[in-house]
Swiss-Prot record:
<dbReference type="GO" id="GO:0001164">
    <property type="term" value="F:RNA polymerase I core promoter sequence-specific DNA binding"/>
</dbReference>
<keyword id="KW-0479">Metal-binding</keyword>
<feature type="region of interest" description="N-terminal cyclin fold">
    <location>
        <begin position="74"/>
        <end position="261"/>
    </location>
</feature>
<feature type="binding site">
    <location>
        <position position="13"/>
    </location>
    <ligand>
        <name>Zn(2+)</name>
    </ligand>
</feature>
<dbReference type="GO" id="GO:0070860">
    <property type="term" value="C:RNA polymerase I core factor complex"/>
</dbReference>
<comment type="similarity">
    <text>Belongs to the RRN7/TAF1B family.</text>
</comment>
<keyword id="KW-0804">Transcription</keyword>
<feature type="region of interest" description="B-linker">
    <location>
        <begin position="69"/>
        <end position="73"/>
    </location>
</feature>
<feature type="modified residue" description="N-acetylmethionine">
    <location>
        <position position="1"/>
    </location>
</feature>
<dbReference type="GO" id="GO:0005668">
    <property type="term" value="C:RNA polymerase transcription factor SL1 complex"/>
</dbReference>
<feature type="modified residue" description="N6-acetyllysine">
    <location>
        <position position="440"/>
    </location>
</feature>
<dbReference type="InterPro" id="IPR033599">
    <property type="entry name" value="TAF1B/Rrn7"/>
</dbReference>
<dbReference type="GO" id="GO:0005634">
    <property type="term" value="C:nucleus"/>
</dbReference>
<dbReference type="GO" id="GO:0017025">
    <property type="term" value="F:TBP-class protein binding"/>
</dbReference>
<keyword id="KW-0862">Zinc</keyword>
<keyword id="KW-0238">DNA-binding</keyword>
<comment type="subunit">
    <text>Interacts with FLNA (via N-terminus). Component of the transcription factor SL1/TIF-IB complex, composed of TBP and at least TAF1A, TAF1B, TAF1C and TAF1D. In the complex interacts directly with TBP, TAF1A and TAF1C. Interaction of the SL1/TIF-IB subunits with TBP excludes interaction of TBP with the transcription factor IID (TFIID) subunits. Interacts with TBP and RRN3. Part of Pol I pre-initiation complex (PIC), in which Pol I core assembles with RRN3 and promoter-bound UTBF and SL1/TIF-IB complex.</text>
</comment>
Length: 588
């Protein structure tokens, strides 16, 4: 980009009113203050100096020839913006409303750029050495609803194209020169202008953008829109390659050269972790200082009553269990709007793990009905089996043993396919990464050798062609009454585990064991510990099944079950606390 050649252009920027212009590689004028790219080209005043050229349009000028080796000058934030654009498009293709990309994610990203002092502020961090001041009045709530698109439906430009700013900012803005310090360094160490600086930047109180943060932005946007996609669904869609994440950089335009330090910023070779993305979601929401999110009400997909029904259907459990899960939700207060709604500006900002909580409620109901102590559930199964044999025309009683056998087989098959798919996953991108242009030929040669070896190996083992991408679905297990090979338990009765007492129904099981006897102290990093050997095989299977569905650690689900029990049996825990305090007093 040449600032000297752009000095002749004296018009004010339509976005920030500054008169500070540079030239892109295509010959377009761009504002060095807000990076707004105009449609005006540099005028060619003397064509005699340029051989073999023709004037095709008046006042259009001649596009500058792209240097294919150097490519565009671009910043790291623009790379993340392009990835967010691709992820938003993928979510749109999955059925999410266009408002998520056009309004919600647009405003979240713009607010992040200002809060992190990368754009929409005085002296962005990558244009001057002075510490910039964020203009807080630029992002009023009325401004959020009226601003034009940042991530355009038509294209994703290399620079931020829009964003209305306050009048005070227009009068106080000054032109900033593009930093020359990193130009020679970036040509060797990174493809982006600020790749080296960005990888070394550590500023207290600033949330640094990473690849996992892109998923946090997506989930925040989904949560704001109250879309029918949970965090576990989002991560599963990433795993199934419906949403760009692994090797997302290979979708960059050819002119955006990526090498050197950019490898560590955009290259990632690990699957996103549920707990990590959850924490980053809360972190980003707090950093952006977002207002209270729209209420999660009973008719919202993320409400536990609806999610419980969804997961009961998925794991082939009786529909009658839904009334029991709703009762637990009511008793624990987990269906209250204030409990479910995310409020980043609250004193203790935290959002609910909606999917994990719903599954934990189902586990608690299973313990209430069947105890899950490797004994009582099997005795109830014997009663159900005998009843079903004698009354084949009546509505069948739910048989826990038969359900366990069918689900165990389906679960093992599904998990084996999942493990095989993960083992076969090719982490290397089609677009090789390299540290410098010196390494470029070697990187491409190695990639070519790997592709050839894979083809030869496939021929030797006579492996069938890899199946195409699976169509996205909210369900991983499907159960229907028409399926003759597998029993569908949705319509089965819980009469074998319930007994009538007056006008109410009680469980035949009068016992209950707590998943956690004592919670860890507040300064500990976890709620409780989980060791499989300490629990029954039935309980282990239930946790493993649901953990696989949500792609989470078993210990995380065990913690959530313990928290549900703590709310449900609050009196029992309070009695234990009093006893422990009295013992301490006696010791003194």
């Amino acid at each position: 980009m040449d600032l000297e050649e752009a000095e002749e252009f004296k018009e004010r920027c339509t976005q920030c009113a500054a008169v500070s212009w540079g030239l892109t590689d295509e010959g377009k004028y761009y504002c060095t203050s807000c990076h707004n790219v105009t449609e005006r080209y540099q005028e060619v005043t003397n064509t005699d100096l340029i051989p073999n050229t023709q004037i095709k349009a008046l006042n259009r000028g001649l596009k500058k020839k792209n240097n294919t080796e150097k490519g565009w000058d671009w910043y790291v934030c623009e790379g993340f913006q392009y990835i967010l654009y691709q992820q938003a498009e993928a979510l749109k293709n999955l059925g999410v409303g266009p408002e998520l990309k056009n309004d919600v994610l647009h405003n979240f990203w713009k607010r992040y750029l200002q809060k992190s002092k990368q754009a929409y502020c005085k002296n962005p961090v990558y244009t001057t050495g002075r510490k910039p001041t964020v203009l807080e009045d630029n992002l009023s709530h009325s401004d959020w609803a009226s601003e034009p698109e940042l991530l355009s439906d038509v294209s994703c430009p290399p620079f931020l194209e829009s964003g209305a700013e306050s009048q005070s900012d227009i009068h106080t803005r000054k032109p900033f020169p593009v930093s020359k310090a990193s130009q020679s360094e970036t040509s060797v160490c990174s493809g982006s202008l600020d790749g080296v600086e960005y990888s070394q930047r550590k500023e207290k109180g600033i949330v640094k953008m990473t690849m996992p943060q892109t998923l946090a932005f997506c989930y925040l946007s989904l949560l704001w829109q109250r879309e029918a996609i949970t965090l576990s669904d989002l991560l599963r869609f990433v795993e199934e390659d419906h949403i760009p994440y692994i090797n997302a950089f290979q979708h960059f335009p050819e002119q955006m050269k990526l090498y050197g330090r950019d490898r560590g910023i955009f290259g990632i070779e690990s699957w996103p972790d549920y707990e990590d993305i959850y924490k980053k979601t809360v972190e980003v929401g707090t950093f952006l200082d977002l207002p209270r999110f729209p209420d999660i009400t009973e008719d919202c997909y993320l409400h536990p009553n609806i999610l419980c029904m969804k997961y009961l259907m998925e794991v082939n459990l009786p529909d009658e269990m839904h009334s029991l899960t709703c009762h637990v939700v009511k008793m624990t207060g987990m269906g209250e709007v204030d409990f479910l709604t995310f409020d980043p500006i609250a004193k203790m900002a935290k959002t609910v793990k909606y999917d994990v909580q719903a599954v934990a409620i189902i586990v608690v109901v299973l313990k209430l009905l069947f105890l899950l102590d490797d004994s009582f559930e099997w005795s109830l199964s014997n009663l159900a089996e005998k009843h079903n044999e004698k009354n084949k025309k009546d509505k069948p009683w739910f048989d826990f043993r038969k359900w366990y056998q069918i689900m165990k087989k389906a679960f093992d098959e599904k998990k084996q396919k999942w493990e095989e798919a993960r083992a076969k996953y090719l982490w290397k991108s089609e677009k090789p990464l390299y540290y410098s242009f010196v390494d470029k030929p070697v990187a491409y040669k190695k990639r070519e050798m790997v592709v050839n070896l894979q083809k030869q190996f496939s021929t030797l083992v006579e492996s069938t062609a890899t199946a195409g991408k699976k169509s996205p679905s909210s369900f991983q297990f499907n159960w229907t009454e028409e399926d003759t090979d597998r029993t569908c338990f949705h319509g089965h009765s819980l009469q074998g585990v319930l007994k009538e007492k007056g006008q109410s129904l009680l469980t035949k099981n009068s016992l209950y064991w707590l998943s956690t006897q004592k919670f860890c102290r507040c300064y500990c990093t976890h709620v409780t510990t989980y060791e499989e050997s300490n629990y029954s095989l039935s309980y282990q299977f239930i946790l493993n099944l649901f953990s696989f569905l949500l792609r989470i650690k078993t210990s995380l689900l065990h913690e959530e079950v313990s928290l549900v029990e703590k709310k449900l049996f609050e009196k029992k825990y309070s009695v234990k606390r009093k006893k422990s305090r009295s013992k301490k007093v006696r010791r003194h």
